[in-house]
């Protein structure tokens, strides 16, 4: 600063400052300027001090000498996840409480036995068998909502638990390279059997603290971008990708929406379809909506047995559709969220079996099953080329839905549209093409032949057939005269109708002689059809629409139907129901078209719409029609009868009514025939059962006679003395005695059977059945064996039971104790029952019945002898 005095007055630069504390040593500059102070030069010393707090020095995350072969193969300094040192506390689900009570009873019995020294092993074994049976029944018949609770079990193994159990090496990778690392999604490189994979999955917590840290496995956009980054990394280096799905859904808070939650999910969906490496998705818990799909667009979707995959949580669905959270069980049933339901819908590609009570009961075994499934799926996918992999992934999702989309197959449009421009000018009205005379004559000749075939020669006294023939000849002449333009006015359609009515009456009179083979109602219906085909409307000036079916085509269809009915009656078989239904549908279309034309011509379109609306409201409310509405309907029908084509409409309605009656009669006849057949079969079964009981009774009487009983006991004691369970250990003399005893029993039994009223035929053993059926029996055995193999390889339940049986046999070491033997027997019975239920095929049943039906025809058949107990052994 200059040594001369400086007066700080007036408007100086310091006046622009607004701070009241700016100045020299805390004195404002503005105050200094006003006071007119004179500043002298002096030495100024300025010192700046800062107090720094003591901070903890951060350690570098990478170890100076990492051990890649440490236990579990994980570089622990890259992951905060550690396996639990102690098993978690057991959590009892609501539906498991009955099992817990049984378990407490077993423990109480054991404590009592230890304290008192009383042997309660039998009671304990019985309770354990009962507990095991209840456990199997409970977990093999879980409802969808119960599987949801198992999938959400707090102790269920998480994604990183499986990584720790099934990988030789695993390095967790972090970050989305945009400044955030979402803990809800974990990912890393791992190796299985020497092959490197990129593993990505939702990570849930194992306690409340971990769940809060992991955000309950609900990812934010950062998590999906992190997953996409690592997928692209794996795609670049050629690592197959395995994703693990276990999330209730994407995190739906306001900030996630602002950061682009929907965009991140959509970006993942699009990018996953373009990955050039195999992709497998495994649902290990619950898969919720888009949060699961964002890492679930894979070539194969596998599901654990108790996992669920849904578009909306059952609780949310119940609240939306049924306005109550209590409707969650119904919603879970309707949503089809279980693994088995999704496998049937071809959404899931496979089911990985779980331990009996869920994956949380044996996490290590569960991880090994997942490992096996990954290896099998990867062996299949690695054989495909890159192009085939992408196509396979696309087709998997394209075929989803009710009908699915089949690629490369042209689809014919349901409604074709003519896009050609209409030519200028009014096209001439097309005239109705008349039915050819030859066709009408052929129709009448066929009808005449059908009626004459229905007569009996014994009814020639009345000779109604000749009267019908003359009536038809007269009808033919009238029709040919009517076709002549000069005589058309002389022969109106009413005369033709009168002759047809007369013809109908003559036939009905002839029908009373009970000589007609063809049902009268059918012939009458055919005459009505012919009448409508021949009758030409007097109003020939009306224009014919392009979509109208010509009368000749209707006549041909009715002729085909009549021929089918007549041939079906002559051959004692039913007429083709397809032709009848087709004719009815054709007539319905014609009636609807004529009705639409009549409504349009009478100007009743708006009235019809109004009436339909009022009738629909009345039906919806289950209320009768009001008198006013009935009057309006009656007025509508009267006005409709004035339409130009009303007579055509009435004729076609009558024809439709008659054909429908024929169909009803045929259906009724079919039902009656079916009822008679069922009754006959029932009577046969009852008679067979009665005879079987009678034969058993007679056999018991024969065996209970003192002489036979004494010989039987003597032979039995000799066989026991020889100590031979098969015939190879018996001497010739003893064999001879047994044969003689069998002959004596057969003779006594034959005498007893004759007293029942049955005939006995002597047939050598083994010759009572048809040798030609041997190939059929072998084929049936092969089919049954094939079905059993398919079920054993495809059913998760059967697989699990077989694995448990193998494990139980291995534990026993070939010498099972009573407890182990009971468990083995229980598992064997369960496997047999499951196989029997799964192989319950109608085709196999039919083959078996065809083979076994002749077995009861002769008494000496080996199977019948075994059935009534003749072939007893002496062991």
UniProtKB/Swiss-Prot annotation:
Pathway in which the depicted protein is active: Lipid metabolism; malonyl-CoA biosynthesis; malonyl-CoA from acetyl-CoA: step 1/1
CoA carboxyltransferase C-terminal domain location: 128-380
Effect of residue 297 to A: Loss of 30% of carboxyltransferase activity in E.coli
Catalyses which reaction(s): N(6)-carboxybiotinyl-L-lysyl-[protein] + acetyl-CoA = N(6)-biotinyl-L-lysyl-[protein] + malonyl-CoA
Keyword tRNA processing among UniProt keywords: no
Signal peptide: none
Transit peptide: 1-50
Bias kind Basic and acidic residues: ranges: 860-869
HAMAP family: AcetylCoA_CT_alpha
The protein's name: Acetyl-coenzyme A carboxylase carboxyl transferase subunit alpha, chloroplastic
């Amino acid at each position: 600063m200059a040594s001369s005095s400086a007066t700080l007055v007036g408007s100086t630069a310091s006046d622009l400052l607004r701070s009241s504390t700016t100045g020299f040593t805390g004195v404002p500059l503005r105050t200094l300027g006003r006071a007119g102070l004179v500043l002298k030069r002096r030495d100024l010393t300025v010192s700046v001090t800062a107090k720094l707090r003591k901070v903890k020095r951060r350690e570098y995350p990478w170890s100076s000498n990492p051990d890649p072969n440490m236990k579990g193969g994980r570089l622990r300094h890259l992951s905060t996840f550690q396996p639990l040192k102690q098993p978690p506390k057991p959590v009892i689900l609501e539906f498991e409480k009955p099992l817990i009570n049984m378990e407490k009873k077993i423990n109480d019995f054991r404590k009592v036995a230890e304290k008192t020294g009383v042997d309660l092993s039998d009671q304990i074994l019985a309770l354990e068998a009962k507990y095991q049976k209840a456990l199997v029944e409970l977990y093999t018949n879980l409802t969808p909502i119960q599987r949801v609770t198992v999938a959400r079990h707090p102790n269920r193994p998480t994604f990183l638990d499986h990584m720790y159990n099934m990988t030789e090496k695993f390095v967790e990778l972090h970050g989305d390279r945009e400044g955030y690392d979402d803990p809800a999604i974990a990912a890393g490189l791992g190796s299985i059997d020497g092959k490197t994979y990129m593993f990505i999955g939702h990570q849930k917590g194992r306690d409340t603290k971990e769940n809060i840290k992991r955000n309950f496995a609900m990812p934010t956009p950062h998590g999906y971008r992190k997953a996409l980054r690592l997928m692209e990394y794996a795609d670049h280096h050629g690592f197959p990708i395995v994703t693990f799905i276990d999330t209730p859904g994407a995190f739906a808070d306001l900030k996630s929406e602002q950061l682009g939650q929907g965009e991140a999910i959509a970006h993942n969906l699009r990018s996953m379809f373009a990955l050039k490496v195999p992709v497998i998705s495994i649902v290990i818990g619950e898969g919720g909506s888009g949060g699961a799909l964002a890492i679930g667009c894979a070539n194969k979707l596998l599901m654990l047995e108790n996992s669920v995959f849904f578009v909306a949580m059952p609780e949310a669905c119940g609240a939306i559709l049924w306005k109550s959270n209590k409707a969650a069980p119904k919603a879970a049933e309707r949503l089809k969220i279980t693994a088995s339901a999704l496998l049937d819908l071809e959404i899931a590609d496979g089911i990985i079996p779980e331990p009996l009570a869920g994956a949380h009961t044996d996490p290590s075994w569960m991880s090994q099953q997942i490992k096996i499934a990954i290896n099998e799926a990867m062996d299949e996918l690695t054989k495909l080329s890159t192009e085939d992999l992408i196509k396979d992934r696309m087709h998997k999702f394209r075929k989803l839905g009710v009908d699915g989309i089949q690629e490369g197959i042209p689809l014919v449009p349901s409604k074709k549209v003519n896009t050609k421009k209409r030519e200028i000018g009014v096209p001439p009205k097309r005239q109705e093409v008349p039915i050819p005379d030859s066709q009408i004559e052929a129709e009448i000749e066929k009808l005449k032949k059908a009626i004459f075939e229905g007569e009996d020669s014994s009814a020639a006294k009345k000779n109604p057939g000749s009267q019908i023939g003359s009536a038809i000849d007269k009808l033919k002449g009238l029709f040919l005269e009517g076709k002549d333009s000069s005589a058309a006015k002389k022969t109106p359609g009413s005369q033709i109708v009168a002759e047809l009515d007369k013809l109908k009456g003559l036939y009905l009179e002839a029908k009373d002689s009970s000589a007609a083979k063809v049902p009268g109602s059918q012939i009458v219906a055919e005459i009505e059809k012919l009448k409508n085909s021949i009758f030409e409307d007097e109003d020939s000036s009306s224009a014919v629409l392009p979509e109208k079916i010509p009368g000749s085509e209707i006549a041909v269809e009715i002729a085909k139907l009549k021929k089918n009915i007549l041939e079906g009656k002559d051959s004692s078989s039913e007429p083709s129901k397809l032709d009848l239904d087709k004719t009815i549908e054709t007539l319905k279309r014609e009636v609807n078209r004529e009705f639409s034309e009549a409504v349009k011509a009478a100007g009743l379109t708006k009235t019809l719409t109004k009436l339909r609306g009022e009738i629909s409201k009345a039906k919806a409310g289950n209320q009768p029609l009001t008198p006013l509405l009935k009057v309006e309907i009656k007025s509508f029908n009267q006005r409709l009868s004035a339409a130009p084509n009303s007579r055509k409409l009435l004729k076609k309605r009558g024809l439709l009514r008659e054909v429908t009656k024929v169909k009803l009669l045929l259906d009724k006849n079919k039902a009656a025939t079916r009822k008679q057949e069922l009754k006959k079969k029932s009577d046969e079964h009852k008679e067979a059962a009665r005879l079987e009981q009678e034969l058993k009774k007679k056999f018991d009487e024969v065996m209970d006679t003192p002489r036979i009983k004494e010989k039987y006991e003597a032979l039995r004691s000799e066989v026991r003395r020889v100590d031979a369970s098969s015939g190879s250990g018996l001497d010739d003399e003893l064999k001879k005695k047994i044969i003689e005893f069998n002959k004596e029993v057969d003779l006594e039994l034959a005498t007893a059977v004759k007293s029942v009223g049955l005939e006995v035929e002597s047939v050598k053993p083994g010759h009572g059945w048809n040798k030609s059926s041997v190939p059929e029996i072998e084929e049936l055995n092969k089919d049954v064996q094939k079905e059993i193999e398919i079920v054993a390889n495809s059913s998760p339940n059967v697989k699990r039971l077989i694995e448990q049986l193998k494990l139980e046999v291995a534990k026993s070491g070939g010498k099972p104790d009573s407890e182990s033997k009971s468990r083995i027997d229980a598992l064997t019975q369960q496997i047999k029952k499951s196989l029997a239920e799964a192989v319950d095929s109608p085709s196999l049943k039919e083959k078996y019945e065809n083979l076994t039906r002749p077995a009861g025809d002769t008494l000496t058949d080996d199977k019948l002898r075994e059935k009534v107990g003749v072939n007893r052994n002496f062991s």
